[in-house]
Structure formats: C-alpha cells, structure tokens
Amino acid sequence: MLTDESLEFARQHIFWFYDTDFYPKPFEFKAIWHSWEEVKKYLISTPIQQLQTTNPKVLPWLKAKGGYRVVHQLEPLDALIYTALVYICAADIEQARMVPSVACSYRISPTDSSFFALGSGFPLYRNSCELLSSRHNYVLSTDISDFYNQIYLHRIANSIEAVSTIPKIGSTIESFLMRLNNKASQGIPVGPAASVVLAEAILIDIDQFITNNHVEHARYVDDIRIFSDSLEELEEILERLVIYLHDQHRLSLSGEKTSIRTTDEFLHEELQNQYQLEKLEILNDIEAGNPYEIYEEPEDADALDDAEDNTSEDELSQTLLDALVRAKNFGYVDLAVLRAIIRRAKSQKIPDLAELILTDIAFFRPVINDVALYLDSLPSAALLRLKKLFSSLCSDRKLESLSTRVWMEWLLTRHPDLLQEPAIRKYVYSGNTIAASSAAIIQKNQAWAKQAKQNLLSLASWNRRASIYSLSALSNNEKNKFISHIMQNPTMTATDKWVCKWVKDGCPELGLVDLHDIFG
C-alpha cells in the first residue's frame, strides 16, 4: 500500500515542517533519515497490518477560552506511515470537495512537502461570509462538538472510498487508526496535518447535505455559517442538520455556539466589531501574512521573512512590543493575533518580547509552542540575559503544566549556558527521561548516561530511545560496545535499531550537500 512516492512526500513534509503542531519534533527522525533507504524498504515491503504501532503520546492543551483539548504525538514511524497513507488519497479528497467559497478551509494542494500549499483559507472564509451576508437577511452559526475526537473511523473509510480511485485505501487508514487508538473506533489524532485532510473528507457529504437544502453556506473546518432570507427556513434546516449528523456520523452540534441572527448582527458581532477592527489593525501594523496558519509553517520560513523585511529592527521591535501589549489587553487569548506577533518576532530574532512573555507565562500557555520556538531563535546573548528569570520560573514552579514542561524542557536543553543555573538544571533533570537525556548529551554528563545503561531495556519506547541517544555522551569504545550488546536483544524495535545505528555513527545531521542530494 505504501509507495516510494508517498513515503518521499512524508519524509519531506516532516523534514521541512513538523510531525505534529503541539510537540517538539523528536530526534528520532534524524536517525530515520540517516537510514532512510533501509527504512523505506522496510515500510514498503511490510504489510501495513504487520507494522508495529503504538498509542500516541497525549497532552492536555489549554484552549484560548478555557478548558482543555487532548493533543497527540505519534511514534516517529507511525507519523511517517500516517502522512504517507493520507497523501495517497489526498488529491481524490480535494477533487470531491465543494468549491473553495463554500469549503474554505485548508484546500488540499500537495507539493513536494506540503499538503496545504494554498494556506489555511481563513481569509477566503471571511470574504465568503461577508459576501453572503450582503445577499441574505439571516445566518445560522454553528459548529460540531469536539469534532476530531468524535469522528468515527468507519465513516472515514466510507468517505475516502466513496471518492478515491485507490482500492482499499479508506479501510487501510481505518485499520491503521484503530490500532493507534488501541481498537477504539472513534477519534483521529489532533496535531498532525494529515488529520486535517481526513477531517475535510468527513465534511464532504455534510457540505452536500446543506447545499441539498437549497441554501448558501460557508464553512471553515467545523465552523458552519448558513444563510437565508427566512428565519423559519434556518430553524428547519438546523433541525434537519442535527438529525443528519446524528444518523450519518454520530456527531452533534455545540449548543452554546449555535445561534440564528440577522446578518447585520452577525457582521457587527463576529466580523466587524471594535475588537475585530482592532485585531485587524494590529495584524496590519506588524505586516502579518496569514495569522491563521496553524499547520505547516516551514522551519526555514525565517529566511523568507528576512529577505522581505525592510523595517528597521528598532522600529519593528517597538511595533511588536506595542502589538503584544494591546493583544494582552483584549482580556483573553486571541490565538491568531498572538501567533502572528510571536512568529513575526521569531522570524526577525527580536528579543524584546521575551521578558514580557516570560513574566506572564501562564497567559501564553495556549501558544507555548510558538513561545518556545521564538525563544530558541534568539541569539545566545539574549537568552543568557534571561537566565535569572528562567531560574526564578523554575524555582517558583511556574513551568509545571504538562504542555509548558514539554516545550520548556526542549528549549532549556538546547542551550548549555542556561543549564549552568542550578534551578534550571534541577528542573530539567527532575523531568522526564527525554529531557534529562538531552541535558546529559549537551552537558556531556557521563554519569547520567552510565546510569541510564542499567535499565535501558526495561524502558518504554520513547524513554528507551532517549537513553540510547544519551550514550553519545560516553567514549566511543564504551558506547559502541554497549550498543552492539543491546542490538542483539529481541525486544529492540526497528526504530530502536535505527537510533542505535545513528548514535554509533556519531549522530550525524543532514548538511546542505545532503539536502541537495535528497531534495534536489
């Protein structure tokens, strides 16, 4: 089922972008790229149902308006498989979708590495809503409750096989996701870009159903806006939609997000109110491109931004700082605005936002991934000036939420000067094995690596591989001898062995020459 083309796409997608939006990219991918031809041969020659899959890692992620959603990170090999499988049917799914003015979100246009070369589609959604509001008197606003977690996998298979020319691709994806879910038949991973494609597949017949009721609508993911000149007609359609979603998908609408308003009220309350106007003003001030891009921001995007920016650093720094203060004064987290500001600061390596963000780190938890990536982009001297603030945050337990810990551990273990601070070092080494291993490597902490050898084979997958990685802190003789020993153990998985080979070979990174050879 997996092909050379689909796996090459998955490789480039994960290399240039991310495996999930909510976790740092794991080091295991470096090991996989190091043995890529062997990995690819293994995945192509092994039937999908015989490939070992493991439940994803999960995090509670704070929503902008309170409450949590569960987000995921797949095992590295599972992430490759998932991306490759969805790539196989992505073009067929896009072909079956309604026109972009209706199904606005994430138009699927695969390139060599991206599912969504045309962007998120949010500006198109906004324009469609404004146009339809000018034509009609009323609008029904609604969205699907807990959408990703409520999707039935069998419905995904049916939706794909109804539109795809690839035999059994839908049932193959269903079976793969069932194994990821430990046989649960409901829910797709939150975070991977491939899940966005599957969500749009599910929504194909829902768009068709609304159109069959002879009304106009616009949809952005699971946010639906239906327009009519009749209040009564919208009430009837709402009832029909509730039944259709239940009967065909076992989905339900969010009561608190469902309303019927005049289009004038809708425009004023949702698109053209004072808050929205100020928000657009902020985005214009910082020259943000598309602030609604959640998935697929390339890791080399900074270079593109650098080439296009003619604003002086001091001017841009003050503009971004002012924008951040104004955004905080909204009184709640606006994900689009905060992401746009922080990503703009990251692209230009502007350090002046860092202290403001860190002193109110709890406010920024819904965008903690962007915060960490921004801080990591700063010059070493700028980070060093923040060492005491980081230390205080660690001592005062301000970085203990699970999502914050994942990203702050990743950040702090990339900067050895920060680890010289006792409170920071204690924070990192008292965390999970992955963080401690990363710290041991960057600090060349042989004692930690030697201890890690003692129970390495009894550890679960992520921690086992992290401990293998930490062996790079040891002498070549000790490292290679131990790796040769554990490679004979029958509990070692294929990914374990590729990590061993990578560590034994000195943990090489892909250089510019390698990239040219690989990607042309």
Region roles according to the model:
Residues 267-280:
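Short, low-order "capping/linker" segments at domain edges
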Residues 483-520:
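Eukaryotic acidic, Ser/Thr-rich intrinsically disordered low-complexity regions
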Residues 1-167, 178-192:
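Conserved two-metal-ion catalytic palm core of "right-hand" nucleic acid polymerases
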Residues 230-231, 265-267:
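Short secondary-structure transition/capping segments
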Residues 116-221, 225-260, 279, 284-465, ...:
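Conserved polymerase palm-domain catalytic core
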